[in-house]
């Protein structure tokens, strides 16, 4: 399958999460993890997740909802997992809310990148200030007009 989807430089994209990598790139997940203890996750999921990440060149784990947060430590233990994408469930603040900043810092301290989704334009700079720009991939939500885009580009210039 990879031979069919790779581009001219050997990369591929996973468009649902807007990621691309110069090699085998995919989003990995286990949504039932919300119903597993960390011990069960380590026993039944982690070995298979690790095998997937070994095969891939770049991997991003889809961490889905607050009930799955108990799996952050087991995820940080997967050596070849590159990043963790955090999706708060409906009814919770979006990915740019300060209530998630500690989670993002914890993931970064664990050596993984973070994809923050559902971030509003006005939350971008406070998020970068709180977490730092390294290893942070921000997906801005909603319609962003040209003026807002230009303002964001000027705002993030200091972090380049």
Model-identified regions with their sequence ranges:
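Active-site loop segments of alpha/beta catalytic cores
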Residues: 1-160
């Amino acid at each position: 399958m990879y031979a069919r989807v790779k581009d001219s430089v050997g990369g591929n994209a996973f468009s649902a999460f807007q990621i691309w990598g110069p090699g085998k790139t995919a989003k990995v997940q286990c949504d039932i993890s919300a119903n597993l203890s960390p011990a069960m996750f380590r026993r039944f999921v982690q070995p298979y997740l690790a095998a997937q990440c070994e095969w891939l060149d770049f991997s991003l784990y889809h961490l889905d909802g607050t009930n799955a947060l108990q799996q952050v430590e087991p995820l940080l233990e997967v050596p070849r997992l590159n990043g963790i994408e955090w999706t708060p469930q409906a009814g919770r603040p979006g990915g740019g809310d300060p209530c998630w900043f500690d989670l993002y810092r914890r993931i970064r301290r664990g050596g993984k990148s973070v994809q923050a989704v559902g971030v509003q334009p006005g939350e971008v700079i406070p998020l970068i200030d709180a977490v730092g720009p390294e290893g942070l991939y921000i997906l801005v939500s909603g319609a962003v007009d040209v003026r807002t885009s230009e303002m964001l580009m000027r705002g993030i210039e200091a972090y380049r």
